[in-house]
A protein has these predicted regions:
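Short coil-to-helix segment of the ABC ATPase nucleotide-binding domain corresponding to the Q-loop/switch region
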Residues: 113-121
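Conserved signature/switch motifs of ABC ATPase nucleotide-binding domains
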Residues: 152-155, 173
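Helix-to-loop junction immediately C-terminal to a conserved catalytic motif
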Residues: 76
Length: 277
């Protein structure tokens, strides 16, 4: 088997996206209301606005029930906002699309397909030639460390391995933005740390724009370039924080004084910070 480099096959082939002045993601005055069984109106999100530039790893952090996942699902086009607009690459989101990749907290692999076939699924549906599909699948199998398990089915994989496949499958489709809804939330603490390290490494290679949802402050700082701190009922952005810690990163940074300071600041934002805006 030939050696595998950290260079994406698309970059080698010259398909790298040109830098764009417009934000990769723009959320503009988005609100989301639900009708309760009693007939009352519940406001899940209230006039949320923010932007994520190209190649940024952005994190939504907040308590349960603050609308983090709801906002991600709106961005994915799986739900519609009550008001406001969301744009990806300058195009308004009006439903699901190949320009957005999604990794869920739950395990979403097709159980009748192997690891290789799961990663290949979207490429095959788009009619990509077999040779090109093979190159891309091989690259991502190596990126997530699952080449030896390429012909296994999901029932033969651990939870962490299944989430590795989900990440590879999403990235293989080369979306404009990767949406991640607490993808490590169901994993044990040790596996979660391993997955965070893997995601850091994969992101350094792909530089894909990411919107990542978590309630874990450590995870938000470890992974993110920018953190949007949310408050609940209704869901709003309380604070926007840039992470002043250089990349590449590793788990040793949790002892860095800047990391500890940010963790303390975000903790106070979540519990007794300023009013939402």
């Amino acid at each position: 088997m030939g050696s595998v480099t950290a260079t994406s096959p698309r970059l080698v082939a010259g398909f790298a996206a040109e830098p764009q002045a417009e934000p990769r993601l723009k959320v503009a005055e988005v609100s989301l209301h639900y009708r309760t069984p009693s007939g009352d109106t519940f406001t899940a999100l209230d006039k949320v606005s923010f932007e994520v530039p190209d190649q940024q790893f952005a994190v939504l952090v907040g308590p349960s029930g603050c609308g983090k996942s709801s906002l991600l699902y709106l961005t994915a086009g799986l739900n519609e906002p009550t008001s406001g607009e969301i744009f990806v690459g300058g195009k308004q989101v009006d439903g699901p699309g190949a320009d957005r990749g999604m990794v869920f907290q739950g395990y979403t692999l097709f159980p009748w397909l192997t690891v290789r076939q799961n990663i290949e699924f979207g490429l095959k549906r788009r009619g990509m030639p077999a040779g090109e599909r093979k190159d891309i699948v091989e690259y991502y199998l190596n990126e997530v460390g699952l080449h030896r398990f390429a012909d296994n089915y999901s029932k033969q994989l651990s939870g962490g391995m299944m989430q590795r496949v989900a990440i590879a499958r999403a990235l293989a489709n080369d979306p404009q933005i990767l949406l991640m809804d607490e993808p490590f939330g169901a994993l044990d603490s040790q596996t979660r740390l391993q997955m965070q390290q893997l995601l850091l490494r994969v992101w350094e290679h792909s530089k894909k724009t990411v919107l990542f949802v978590t309630h874990d402050i450590d995870e938000a700082i470890l992974l993110g370039d920018r953190i949007f701190v949310m408050g609940a009922r209704p869901g709003r952005i309380k604070e926007v924080l840039d992470v002043p810690i250089s990349r590449p990163r590793n788990l040793d940074m949790v002892m860095d004084p800047e990391f500890i300071r940010m963790k303390r600041d975000i903790f106070h934002q979540l519990h007794d910070g300023p009013q939402e805006h």
